[in-house]
C-alpha cells in the first residue's frame, strides 16, 4: 500500500476559560478553538513494524521519539482495535514545541485518522474517540479539526461551529512554556473554582459570515492562562505588545498555555504584511500568517 499522509494543523484557543480544578487535579475549561493552515505533517508507511521518525525544522525540540504522542495514540488504537494494521510513522515537525498550539495532540489525532483509514474505520467510530481520549486531553478535538467549543477536560465537544475564516498572524518568541507549569502557576487548589464570567455556549448568530463581528465577540472573552504564562515567560508580553501596536491587528490573544500569541486581521493581505514586518524586527521569532477555520 502507498505512503499515507495527513495534516496536523495548529489548534488555536480563541478563548480559554478555566472554570475550576477538579478533586483529581485536572482542570475544567471552556474554550472556543479553531484550526490554522499552519501545522505539522504525519506520514504512515502501512504494515511496517510500529515505529516513529521525527524530522523537520523543529524536530530537535520534540523530545525522544518513544515519548511522542503519535506512538501513544497508535498503541491506544491497537488496544481498542484487535488485529489492527499499524505501520511506521514519519512526523515532519514544523510547529514550535510547548507553544500552546496543540501540536503534539494534533500530530496524535492525525496518526489516528491515518490508522482509521488503513483499517477501514469511520472517523465517528467510538473506538477512535476512546483512543484519542486515552492519548491526551486535546487529542479528541483535533480528530476532526474544525472550529468547536470544547469543555470538561477537552472531552466534551460541540458540533462544528459556523466560524467564518479568520485571517491571523501567529507569533512565537521561541520560548517553550510547559503546560503543567502554567497550570501550577494558576494556583488553584483541588476543588476550587476560578472566579469569572460564564463562557458562552457558542457563537451568536450575528457572527455568521462576519469576521468583524467575531472579533467583537471575542474581545470580551480572555484567556485565563495569560497571567500565569506571562509571569513565567515575560517574553510573551513583549510579543503581545508588538502585535497590539500594529494597526493591522484587530484582536491580540495568547493561545492555550503559551507561548504562541496571535493577532486577527482584516484580510490575508494585511496578515502577510504584518508578518513580514514582525520578522524584519524579530528575525529569530517564529511568525506565520494563516487562516483560522
From Swiss-Prot:
Keywords: ATP-binding, Isoprene biosynthesis, Kinase, Nucleotide-binding, Transferase. InterPro entries: GHMP_kinase_C_dom, GHMP_kinase_C_sf, GHMP_kinase_N_dom, IspE, Ribosomal_Su5_D2-typ_SF, Ribsml_uS5_D2-typ_fold_subgr. It is an enzyme of class 2 (transferase). Its EC number is 2.7.1.148. One of its GO terms (biological process) is terpenoid biosynthetic process. The keyword GTP-binding does not apply. ATP binds at residues 96-106. The active site is at residues 11, 138. It catalyses: 4-CDP-2-C-methyl-D-erythritol + ATP = 4-CDP-2-C-methyl-D-erythritol 2-phosphate + ADP + H(+). The keyword Transferase applies. One of its GO terms (molecular function) is 4-(cytidine 5'-diphospho)-2-C-methyl-D-erythritol kinase activity. It holds the Pfam family GHMP_kinases_C. Pathway: Isoprenoid biosynthesis; isopentenyl diphosphate biosynthesis via DXP pathway; isopentenyl diphosphate from 1-deoxy-D-xylulose 5-phosphate: step 3/6. It comes from the Bacteria. Belongs to the GHMP kinase family. IspE subfamily. HAMAP family: IspE (MF_00061). Catalyzes the phosphorylation of the position 2 hydroxy group of 4-diphosphocytidyl-2C-methyl-D-erythritol. This is 4-diphosphocytidyl-2-C-methyl-D-erythritol kinase. It comes from Xanthobacter autotrophicus (strain ATCC BAA-1158 / Py2). The lineage of its organism: Bacteria, Pseudomonadati, Pseudomonadota, Alphaproteobacteria, Hyphomicrobiales.
